[in-house]
């Protein structure tokens, strides 16, 4: 049986803003996939490790270069999708974390679409957006 991909928003940085669903999926999944930029900073990992014991999980780092080169980005997205599909083919459920919400300018949306197009199951899981968190911090509404 194939696994399923979950593209999970982890909020704007405060680990207390992870949704209950995000925490549950991170605890239950077989693999945690995380975007990795061109340096050693891994903000998403730093956030989730404060809430979930991720060292016990299989981790997959997906390189997402910071570039305007569309070809390079498309290759990175396809490579990420291919790596996740290998996990899904082995029956593993994968959570691909993204800062904020996957429905608002998120890295994982491209991988999500490629995985769906390849015939696999993938679900978007909303997270708290930065603009909503800022409004709350300012004690105002949008």
Which residue ranges define each predicted feature?
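General beta-strand structural signal in soluble alpha/beta enzymes
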Residues: 34, 61, 96-98, 124-127
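Short gly/pro/ser/thr-enriched loop/turn and capping motifs at secondary-structure boundaries
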Residues: 39-41, 67, 129-132
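N-terminal glycine-rich phosphate/adenylate-binding segment common to multiple enzyme folds
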Residues: 79-84, 92-108, 112
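Class I SAM-dependent methyltransferase SAM-binding "motif I" and its flanking Rossmann-like core
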Residues: 100-142
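Glycine-rich, highly charged phosphate/nucleotide-binding loops
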Residues: 13, 73-85
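Glycine-rich phosphate/diphosphate-binding loops that line cofactor/substrate pockets in enzymes
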Residues: 1, 25-28, 82-92
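Glycine-rich, flexible N-terminal cofactor/catalytic loop recognition
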Residues: 1-64
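Short, hinge-like loop/turn segments at secondary-structure boundaries
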Residues: 50-52, 78, 139-142
């Amino acid at each position: 049986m194939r696994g399923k991909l979950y593209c999970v928003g982890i909020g704007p940085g405060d680990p207390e803003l992870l949704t209950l669903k995000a925490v549950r999926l991170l605890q239950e999944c077989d693999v945690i996939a995380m975007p990795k930029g061109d340096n050693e900073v891994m903000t998403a990992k730093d956030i989730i490790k404060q809430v979930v014991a991720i060292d016990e999980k299989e981790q997959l780092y997906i390189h997402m270069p910071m570039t305007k080169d569309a070809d390079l980005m498309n290759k990175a997205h396809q490579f990420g999708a291919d790596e996740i599909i290998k996990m899904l083919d082995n029956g593993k459920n994968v959570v691909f974390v993204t800062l904020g919400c996957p429905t608002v300018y998120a890295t994982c949306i491209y991988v999500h679409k490629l995985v769906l197009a390849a015939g696999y199951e993938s679900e978007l899981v909303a997270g708290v957006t930065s603009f909503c968190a800022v409004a709350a911090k300012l004690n105002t509404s949008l």
